[in-house]
């Protein structure tokens, strides 16, 4: 998609340069050509995703019944790359995907990542654990603190 936009821009620029009597080095478009070039500028005016749409997209991703271990890790890696702490409902879906895959290590790692992403905001991680406690109990997942991993 980006490649097509770049090609359109370069084709438009080449058309203006060919139309110029001075060639490529000093294009001087005619008065009517400036408006044509201006309408072909390559800006990104895509729609912005709301928080609810973002959450729904990730919950849907982790709720895929045929998700495999690689997709789980890729999704978590992408999610961790964002400048945010994932909502508990996203983490819940990721933990359930771990359970479907019988991947206890990834489940604990997800909780470690959430704690790390919370950074200096010490109230975020306890809130997330409080919200996830029913899911953790249902799935039999221990927190890193319960496993003693916070002492290492």
Swiss-Prot record:
Chief location category: mitochondrion
Keyword Nucleotide-binding: no
Pathway the protein contributes to: Energy metabolism; oxidative phosphorylation
Record membrane topology: Peripheral membrane protein
Extent of the transit peptide: 1-43
Record motif SIFI-degron, residues: 2-22
Compartment list: Mitochondrion inner membrane
Modified sites of kind Phosphothreonine: 143
GO terms for biological process, alphabetical: mitochondrial electron transport, cytochrome c to oxygen
A molecular function GO annotation: metal ion binding
Post-translational modification: In response to mitochondrial stress, the precursor protein is ubiquitinated by the SIFI complex in the cytoplasm before mitochondrial import, leading to its degradation. Within the SIFI complex, UBR4 initiates ubiquitin chain that are further elongated or branched by KCMF1.
InterPro entries: Cyt_c_oxidase_su5A/6, Cyt_c_oxidase_su5A/6_sf
Keyword terms, alphabetized: Acetylation, Heme, Iron, Membrane, Metal-binding, Mitochondrion, Mitochondrion inner membrane, Phosphoprotein, Transit peptide, Ubl conjugation
GO cellular component terms listed in the entry, alphabetical order: mitochondrial inner membrane; mitochondrion; respiratory chain complex IV
Claim: Disulfide bond is one of the keywords in the record: no
Top-level taxon of the source organism: Eukaryota
Pfam hit, one: COX5A
Family membership: Belongs to the cytochrome c oxidase subunit 5A family.
Self-association state and partner proteins as the record states: Component of the cytochrome c oxidase (complex IV, CIV), a multisubunit enzyme composed of 14 subunits. The complex is composed of a catalytic core of 3 subunits MT-CO1, MT-CO2 and MT-CO3, encoded in the mitochondrial DNA, and 11 supernumerary subunits COX4I1 (or COX4I2), COX5A, COX5B, COX6A2 (or COX6A1), COX6B1 (or COX6B2), COX6C, COX7A1 (or COX7A2), COX7B, COX7C, COX8B and NDUFA4, which are encoded in the nuclear genome.
Name this polypeptide is given: Cytochrome c oxidase subunit 5A, mitochondrial
Name of the gene this protein is made from: COX5A
């Amino acid at each position: 998609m980006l490649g097509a936009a770049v090609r359109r821009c370069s084709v438009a620029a080449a058309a203006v340069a060919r139309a110029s009597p001075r060639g490529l080095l000093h294009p001087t478009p005619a008065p009517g050509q400036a408006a044509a070039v201006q309408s072909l500028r390559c800006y990104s005016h895509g729609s912005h995703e709301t928080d609810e749409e973002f959450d729904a997209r990730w919950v849907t991703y982790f709720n895929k019944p045929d998700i495999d271990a690689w997709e789980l890790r890729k999704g978590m890696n992408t999610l961790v790359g964002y400048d945010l702490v994932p909502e508990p409902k996203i983490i819940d879906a990721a933990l359930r995907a771990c359970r479907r895959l019988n991947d206890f290590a990834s489940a604990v790692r997800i909780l470690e990542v959430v704690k790390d992403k919370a950074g200096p905001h010490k109230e975020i991680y306890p809130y997330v654990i409080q919200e996830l406690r029913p899911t953790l109990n249902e799935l039999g997942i221990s927190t890193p603190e319960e496993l003693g991993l916070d002492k290492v």
